[in-house]
Swiss-Prot record:
Residues 96-154 are annotated as: Interaction with the F-box domain of F-box proteins. Involved in ubiquitination and subsequent proteasomal degradation of target proteins. Together with CUL1, RBX1 and a F-box protein, it forms a SCF E3 ubiquitin ligase complex. The functional specificity of this complex depends on the type of F-box protein. In the SCF complex, it serves as an adapter that links the F-box protein to CUL1. PANTHER family: SKP1. It is found in: Nucleus. One of its GO terms (biological process) is jasmonic acid mediated signaling pathway. This is SKP1-like protein 13. Belongs to the SKP1 family. Part of a SCF (SKP1-cullin-F-box) protein ligase complex. Interacts with ADO3/FKF1, EBF1, PP2A13, SKIP15, SKIP16, CPR1/CPR30, At1g55000, At3g61590, At1g67340, At1g78100, At3g04660, At4g38940, At4g39550 and At5g49610. It comes from the Eukaryota. Signal peptide: none annotated.
């Protein structure tokens, strides 16, 4: 039987996961190495809803001893569907913040690539709307920036 680790979200939810799942987070892996998990691992900046998504990703990505090309392709397909679901449920950025906080590089990279794909080919106004960023430049300041960076608009 594999060793279990208790993860405690910021809003008080607890999740019992296998150590192989938990150690995909470098942050948690270091806590396990330092023997700091006896009373559970508090994940201060991550709610239960988001932590459950992170755990779902980590469970799917527990490395098998001999992954086949077929299993790699299936995982890529699963990743794409997972990211699409996060995007549609408006939890993508929260999951990315959690991945960064927990140091889960592959999940953070996947999230960053998803955001890059989302903004590719979009105009600044569209990107601001998509990411919820307020434009705090005056029209004059925008024009000045366009002139200074003309090469980027060619």
């Amino acid at each position: 039987m594999s060793k279990m680790v208790m993860l405690l979200s910021s809003d008080g939810e607890s999740f019992q996961v296998e150590e192989a799942v938990a150690v995909q987070s470098q942050t948690i892996a270091h806590m396990i190495e330092d023997d700091c998990v006896a009373n559970g691992v508090p994940i201060a900046n991550v709610t239960g809803v988001i932590l459950s998504k992170v755990i779902e990703y980590c469970k799917k990505h527990v490395v098998s001893d001999s992954p086949t090309e077929e299993s790699k392709d299936e995982l890529k397909k699963w990743d794409a569907e997972f990211m699409k679901a996060l995007e549609q449920s408006s939890t993508l950025f929260d999951v990315m913040l959690a991945a960064n906080y927990l140091n889960i590089k592959d999940l953070l990279d996947l999230g960053c690539q998803t955001v890059a794909d989302m903004i590719t080919g979009k105009k600044p106004d569209e990107i601001r709307a998509l990411l919820g960023i307020e434009n705090d430049f005056t029209p004059e300041e925008e024009e000045e920036i366009r002139k200074e960076n003309q090469w980027a608009f060619e």
